[in-house]
């Protein structure tokens, strides 16, 4: 009997959060181990399906860097990185577009199998993500200048769950590779999302990454600004994205461990959560 009561308590604990976030836009940046491990992938899809089916409005922006690198190697296309960004010449862009489209359609299929009306897009569709060249040395890597959010608003209104590949275009219709974190942040800001969640390969934000007891469960925007200069590596960039989002209309940003099964539900629908909440 006790185990049944525990299950009931889990549902009851979730109830106020389901009510609070009903009809709210939740932007999820999906990448890392949560995309590469099939069991974790299924858990993420279940989480997102549940978010949708209980009344939230999730949107997914996905990466695909490792798959792009693997396909480039298979096809003999040279992969080069500068400051953590892939140098994207014409050949690389073609490979990236192909791989991201394949990932996108698989995600659509997975969610449709869970009863969700999902639709796949890339940033070129309807000029969703308008870009300019980020740096001449990076070739066709784009910085987003404009998000045509009306497209997404109309899809949400029609009960679709948009799944977006981070490929954009410029005014001359050139194709650009976009960092998926940047795309997720830009879209969340344009829609003034309730939440932006980054699925990562770390437990969250650490005050000192070498001290695993320094995990920060919650940090205000002002505290995040003070901490940011002290953080190094990829998490410094991630925290800057969190700050940017919170300063531009996104209410809360979450840094979650995508290696933990059902991390989205644990963060959004429980009192304690499991990651770092910024804002």
From Swiss-Prot:
GO terms for biological process: arginine biosynthetic process via ornithine; L-arginine biosynthetic process. One of its GO terms (molecular function) is acetylglutamate kinase activity. Substrate binds at residues 64-65, 86, 177. This is Acetylglutamate kinase. Its EC number is 2.7.2.8. It catalyses: N-acetyl-L-glutamate + ATP = N-acetyl-L-glutamyl 5-phosphate + ADP. HAMAP family: ArgB. The keyword Electron transport does not apply.
């Amino acid at each position: 009997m006790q185990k049944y009561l525990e299950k009931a308590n889990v549902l009851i604990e979730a109830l106020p959060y389901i009510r609070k976030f009903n009809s709210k836009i939740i932007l999820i940046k999906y990448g890392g181990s949560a995309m590469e491990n099939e069991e974790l992938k299924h858990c993420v899809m279940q989480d997102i399906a549940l978010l949708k089916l209980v009344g939230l409005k999730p949107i997914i922006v996905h990466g695909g860097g490792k798959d792009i690198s693997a396909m480039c190697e298979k096809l003999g296309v040279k992969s080069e990185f500068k400051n953590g960004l892939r140098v994207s010449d014409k050949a690389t862009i073609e490979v990236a577009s192909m791989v991201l489209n394949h990932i996108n359609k698989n995600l659509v299929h997975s969610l449709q199998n869970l009863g969700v009306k999902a639709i796949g897009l890339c940033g070129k569709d309807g000029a969703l993500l308008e870009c300019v060249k980020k740096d001449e040395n990076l070739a066709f890597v784009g910085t987003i200048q404009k998000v045509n959010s009306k497209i997404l608003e109309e899809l949400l209104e029609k009960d679709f769950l948009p799944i977006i590949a981070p490929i954009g275009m410029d005014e001359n219709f050139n194709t650009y590779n976009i960092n998926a974190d940047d795309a997720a942040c830009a879209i969340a800001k344009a829609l003034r999302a309730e939440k932006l969640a980054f699925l990562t390969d770390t437990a969250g934000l650490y005050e000192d990454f070498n001290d695993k007891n320094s995990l920060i469960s919650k940090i205000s925007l002002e505290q995040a600004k003070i901490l940011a200069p002290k953080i190094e590596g990829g998490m410094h960039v991630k925290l800057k994205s969190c700050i940017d989002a919170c300063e531009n209309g996104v209410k809360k940003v979450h840094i979650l461990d995508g290696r933990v099964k059902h991390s989205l539900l644990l963060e959004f629908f429980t009192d304690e959560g499991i990651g770092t909440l910024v804002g």
